[in-house]
Amino acid sequence: MIDPKLLRNDLPMVVAALARRGFDFPEAEYQKLEDLRKASQVKSETLQAERNKLSQQIGKAKSKGEDCADLMAQAAQLESEQAAVEASFNETQKQLDTLLSSVPNLPDDSVPTGKDENDNPEIRRWGTPRTFDFTPKEHADLMQIGLDFTNGVKLAGARFTVLRGALSRLHRAIAQFMLDTHTEEHGYQEMSVPYLVNPQTIYGTGQLPKFEQDLFKTRLSDRDFYLIPTAEVSLTNLVAQEILEESVLPLQFVAHTPCFRSEAGSAGRDVRGMIRQHQFDKVELVHITTPEDSHAALERLTAHAERILQKLELPYRVILLCTGDMGFAARKTYDLEVWLPGQGKYREISSCSNCWDFQARRMQARFRAEGEKRPQLVHTLNGSGLAVGRTLVAILENYQQADGNILIPKALQPYMNGLDRITPSA
């Protein structure tokens, strides 16, 4: 959530920054509610001052043995009036919070203005795409090595996949390799987190209320739960309602979880294969840090995700998302796009975002700087390190051979009991 003080102190700047994202801030509605909030606050403070004055008068009258019935009646009337004003204040504040909960984060000054993915500048590339002496296939056409879309549809429906045999083991190996790299080389703390979370948790990272249609929801007795669309939700909320000491920062969490997305609005996109699934595995990275460190933390986080692709020898590029392509909670985002020779193009495999204090304000996640009494909001960052299914897709397409075999990257062979290739079944 955007800082309310920033809205009150520099509304034109906020409106202009949001306009860069293509977001039309409801300025008139906001100003009306803000004026009501201020008026209620001033009225409540005035009534409280009058009550305090009457309280002193009542105390003096009682000490002198004087009749104070009239004063007490006035005090009761003021208390009733103040309660009504405070109820009005709370209702107005609730309406303000509802309005602001659907307003996206402000873009960082370094983020280029743009409309969509066509306006995203490329920052760098790594690796050279392989030259094939045959026409490489898309992964969806490599079904004989263990991709079973038919049973995915039978068991659940469209956008679900069954993996068989060595391919299923490779999928598991990829996740284990990612976890080992991030914990042993990059210093992350591995976490095992719930896949079902309550509404407050998923509100904290910004999925509610604006993106409820993208979520899977279930109910137990009178309690609502949401299936996580990413482990970012669970990992980031570990610090919700907490006041951390600066000495423990930065925190770096990693988790391997399934993720669940309805893919609302994706009809007709990536209908073949594993690129866009309702259920997929991902290794997620989360940083909790100080405002002073968050810019550098985004570069570190992105480098950690890149390291996985480098160790797997998969060509990729880094893209800086423009204002029109960023996620709701992000202030700045880098996308990693891996080369898929079967498709003949780069495809997203990771998004690494700095959310500044946007999520922290919703979660009330704070830290206390050394020597300071008053806590301040942490900064939160998240990124895929990486999407497991899309990494599998990239391996299938980049390591395919003319005879139908899929070579296993050297970095993954220790996780495959020395197996160096997957051979297609008859």
Swiss-Prot record:
It comes from the Bacteria. L-serine binds at T230, A231, E232, E284, S384. Pfam families: Seryl_tRNA_N (PF02403), tRNA-synt_2b (PF00587). GO terms for molecular function: ATP binding; serine-tRNA ligase activity. SUPFAM superfamilies: Class II aaRS and biotin synthetases, tRNA-binding arm. The keyword Ligase applies. ATP binds at R261, S262, E263, E348, I349, S350, S351. Keywords: Aminoacyl-tRNA synthetase, ATP-binding, Cytoplasm, Ligase, Nucleotide-binding, Protein biosynthesis. Its EC number is 6.1.1.11. It is found in: Cytoplasm. The keyword Transit peptide does not apply. Residues 103-129 are annotated as: Disordered. Residues 114-125 have a biased composition (Basic and acidic residues). Homodimer. The tRNA molecule binds across the dimer. Catalyzes the attachment of serine to tRNA(Ser). Is also able to aminoacylate tRNA(Sec) with serine, to form the misacylated tRNA L-seryl-tRNA(Sec), which will be further converted into selenocysteinyl-tRNA(Sec). Belongs to the class-II aminoacyl-tRNA synthetase family. Type-1 seryl-tRNA synthetase subfamily. PANTHER family: SERINE--TRNA LIGASE (PTHR43697:SF1), SERYL-TRNA SYNTHETASE (PTHR43697). NCBIfam families: serS (TIGR00414). This is Serine--tRNA ligase. It comes from Dichelobacter nodosus (strain VCS1703A). The lineage of its organism: Bacteria, Pseudomonadati, Pseudomonadota, Gammaproteobacteria, Cardiobacteriales.
